[in-house]
């Protein structure tokens, strides 16, 4: 990880231009410095003030347009000076090395004046410029060093000569660098250590880069890090040299041949102390950080256009990334994430994104830990319901960096308009939303939990404050793995447009409650009778004594009248996991909404779908066991 200029930074990574203001006492040579830079020779005649100079991006080392502004006390008012200070990104305070009065004015006038015009928490970076070094045999550094130690906003001090062009280009490079690669957010000179925000950002970067999660960066991980940040690999000897530097200074910076977090942080401290903080900034910006060490909105929320009637899903590359993320943190290889393993995974997040309800939204093991399938299901749910949140989460995990993609938007597939699916009588979607509707206590939550393979005994153990209104799991239809997302819709007289929007409707009534079916019938007539959304009626709690429903016709006759499949008997009160038949039917109806009601009532149609589900569930389990053996 050598200190170098590294990869070209993207436009969003740092400021689009730099504005440098030169101030100082009269006749210290401010204008001469600017004119010497532009003409590359000392001007014989110097005007009272130089016009604003713009240096194009292609001739500056950092490829950023730079504006250089001169200040003349003779030509400008105090108000104009204050305005220039407010517009500047960096200020060069120029003094003459042979003029003690101009040096004294640095602290008695200029620094206080500038600081009065800037916020205490975001001071402008300052460069002290000692001009006319050609006129003396000595250096002013002894006098200037205490000033630099007193004011942390001073980035550096440069002695130069406009007459013989000494350090002129270096002066403006340092000024530009002070804006693009500021020391302030990274390092505290008084404490001689990195600031907490910088340590936090670099720790996240280390954890993302530690792809096998063993607490060190091995040679392969260091080389990958070097390549994505600086566009160049490290030779084996260079890698060893880096580790030797760390070994020389701290005892626990290298372990098992890899760089530890302490070693990683030490290297960056060393870069900053040696004035090579552009190296640390290159790394920070590559991983999405701005000048305040916050992740940028451009990094977390890349542009993703989603037309109406389209949904969002994870693509194959995203699932591979999430599989590797799961494997990285499943340290005991039990195909489930314990609370500690999940906490470790979320250390790269600024907050814990999942609450206890997630454990009742997706599949868990007997300990209540999210399984491999449950982990992928939760990401699928987030992508479908709130794709911006999914992009944010993938950003925290470093998706675009580890997969070397432009952004995490490349992880998302935007499905085509549902109307096209209906016209073509086929769908490319893999996630289907089913709204589960019924009276309170009719058994809707039982249906949701049954999708996760939980019987009534297991459901009774769920705390009220941990309940979820969503459940998602995979279902096999005709040998294809699809995700079925169930949403429990609260009972109300009229449904909102958002509550109607789905691929299939599951209308649930309680066979033991005579008033239960009437609500399903009313909601169907109000919202779904004339729509193209397929509906399935589920007769829940079928293990209880069935009573006659207080409605004009029976549920069976109602289904026949409206050309729907007959009511599906369902119960969670089973010794093993509840039957998955209704979920296969719901997913099939969502996949094939154009299929005629006659086909839906055909036992052969359902047999083909269910047989495919059984075969692929068995195959899936076999592949799962094979995966375990490989791991």
Curated annotation (Swiss-Prot):
Its EC number is 3.6.5.-. One of its GO terms (biological process) is mitochondrial outer membrane permeabilization. It comes from the Eukaryota. Keywords: Acetylation, Calcium, GTP-binding, Hydrolase, Isopeptide bond, Magnesium, Membrane, Metal-binding, Mitochondrion, Mitochondrion outer membrane, Nucleotide-binding, Repeat, Transmembrane, Transmembrane helix, Ubl conjugation. Residues 1-605 are cytoplasmic. Mg(2+) 2 binds at residue 441. Its main location: mitochondrion. It is found in: Mitochondrion outer membrane. One of its GO terms (molecular function) is GTP binding. The Miro 2 domain is necessary for efficient ubiquitination by PRKN. Belongs to the mitochondrial Rho GTPase family. This is Mitochondrial Rho GTPase 1. It comes from Bos taurus (Bovine).
């Amino acid at each position: 990880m050598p200190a170098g200029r590294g990869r070209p930074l993207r436009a969003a990574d740092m400021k689009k231009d730099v504005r440098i203001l030169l101030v100082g006492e009269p006749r210290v040579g401010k204008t001469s410095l600017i004119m010497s830079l532009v003409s590359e020779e000392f001007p014989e005649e110097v005007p009272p003030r130089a016009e604003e100079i713009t240096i194009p991006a292609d001739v500056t080392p950092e490829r950023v347009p730079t504006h250089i502004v001169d200040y003349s006390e003779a030509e400008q008012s105090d108000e104009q000076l204050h305005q220039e200070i407010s517009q500047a990104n960096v200020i060069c305070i120029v003094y003459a090395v042979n003029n003690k009065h101009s040096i004294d004015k640095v602290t008695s006038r200029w620094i206080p004046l500038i600081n009065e015009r800037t916020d205490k928490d975001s001071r402008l970076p300052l460069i002290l410029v000692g001009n006319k070094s050609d006129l003396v045999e000595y250096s002013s550094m002894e006098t200037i060093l205490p000033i630099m130690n007193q004011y942390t906003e001073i980035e550096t001090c440069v002695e130069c000569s406009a007459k013989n062009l000494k350090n002129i280009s270096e002066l403006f490079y340092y000024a530009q660098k002070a804006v693009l690669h500021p020391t302030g957010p990274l390092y505290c000179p008084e404490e001689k250590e990195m600031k907490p925000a910088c340590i936090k950002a670099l720790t996240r970067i280390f954890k993302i880069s530690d792809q096998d999660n063993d607490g060190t960066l091995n040679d392969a991980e260091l080389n990958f890090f070097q390549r994505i940040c600086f566009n160049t690999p490290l030779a084996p000897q260079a890698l060893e040299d880096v580790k030797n530097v760390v070994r020389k200074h701290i005892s626990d910076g290298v372990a098992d041949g890899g760089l530890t977090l302490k070693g990683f942080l030490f290297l960056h401290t060393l870069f900053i102390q040696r004035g090579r903080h552009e190296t640390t900034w290159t790394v920070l910006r590559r991983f999405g950080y701005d000048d305040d060490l916050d992740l940028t909105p451009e990094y977390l929320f890349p542009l993703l256009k989603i037309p109406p009637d389209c949904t969002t899903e994870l693509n194959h590359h995203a699932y591979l990334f999430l599989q590797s993320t799961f494997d990285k943190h499943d340290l005991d290889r039990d195909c489930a994430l314990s609370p500690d393993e999940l906490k470790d995974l979320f250390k790269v997040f600024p907050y814990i994104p999942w609450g206890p309800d997630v454990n009742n939204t997706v599949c868990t093991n007997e300990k209540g830990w999210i399984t491999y399938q449950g982990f992928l299901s939760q990401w699928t749910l987030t992508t479908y319901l709130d794709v911006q949140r999914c992009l944010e989460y993938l950003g925290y995990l470093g998706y675009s960096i580890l997969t070397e993609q432009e952004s995490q938007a490349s992880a998302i597939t935007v499905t085509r308009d549902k109307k096209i699916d209906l016209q073509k009588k086929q769908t490319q979607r893999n996630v289907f939303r089913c709204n589960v509707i019924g009276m309170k206590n009719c058994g809707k939550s039982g249906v949701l939990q049954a999708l996760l393979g939980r019987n009534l005994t297991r459901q009774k153990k769920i705390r009220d404050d941990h309940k979820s209104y969503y459940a998602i799991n995979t279902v096999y239809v005709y040998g294809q793995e699809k995700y079925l997302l169930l949403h429990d819709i609260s009972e109300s007289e009229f449904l909102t447009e958002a509550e109607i929007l789905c691929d299939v409707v599951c209308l649930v009534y309680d066979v033991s409650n005579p008033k239960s079916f009437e609500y399903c019938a009313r909601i169907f007539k109000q919202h779904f009778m004339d729509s193209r959304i397929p509906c399935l009626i589920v007769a829940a709690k079928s293990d209880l004594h069935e009573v006659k429903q207080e409605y004009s016709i029976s549920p069976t006759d109602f289904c026949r009248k409206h050309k729907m499949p007959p009511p599906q008997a369902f119960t969670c009160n089973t010794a093993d996991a509840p039957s998955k038949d209704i979920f296969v039917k719901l997913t099939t109806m969502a996949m094939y909404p154009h299929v005629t009601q006659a086909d839906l009532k055909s036992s052969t149609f359902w047999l083909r779908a269910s047989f495919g589900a059984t075969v692929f569930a068995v195959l899936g389990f076999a592949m799962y066991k094979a995966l375990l053996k490989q791991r």
